[in-house]
């Protein structure tokens, strides 16, 4: 499985990778830490899943979701965030995110990834 991970914080990036590995998910991860790197990655390869921080210093998660929908509309997108309010969570799901996971509750990431991939496969088969 090829994942594009948009995360500017190295420690969080490593924690997300470790969590995915501990969940038994075998994946190749491409990292992006800025809008430019994310955009270039979207243009250079096809991904099975995109995971993005909701809040980045110079780029919003919603903008990243929008960009991914334009270039890879069928790729599931999951937000991770330290804090995400109810309004932001609803906005992200309405905008096309498959799910969101709080960084303090990363034990739910594996389940969110599996569900997002399963739902994307079901949509593709229709």
Say what each PLM segment does:
Residues 2, 8-25, 32, 40-125:
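N-terminal membrane insertion elements
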Residues 37:
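Short acidic active-site motifs
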């Amino acid at each position: 499985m090829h994942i594009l991970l948009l995360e500017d914080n190295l420690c969080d990036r490593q924690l997300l990778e470790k969590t995915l590995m501990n969940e038994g998910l075998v994946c190749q991860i491409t990292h992006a830490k800025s809008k430019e790197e994310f955009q270039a990655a979207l243009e250079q390869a096809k991904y099975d899943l995109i995971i993005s921080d909701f809040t980045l210093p110079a780029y919003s998660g919603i903008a990243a979701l929008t960009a991914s929908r334009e270039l890879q509309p069928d790729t599931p997108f999951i937000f991770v965030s330290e804090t995400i309010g109810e309004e932001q969570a609803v906005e992200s799901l309405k905008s096309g995110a498959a799910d969101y996971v709080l960084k303090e509750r990363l034990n739910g990431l594996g389940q969110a990834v599996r569900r997002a991939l399963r739902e994307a496969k079901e949509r593709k088969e229709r």
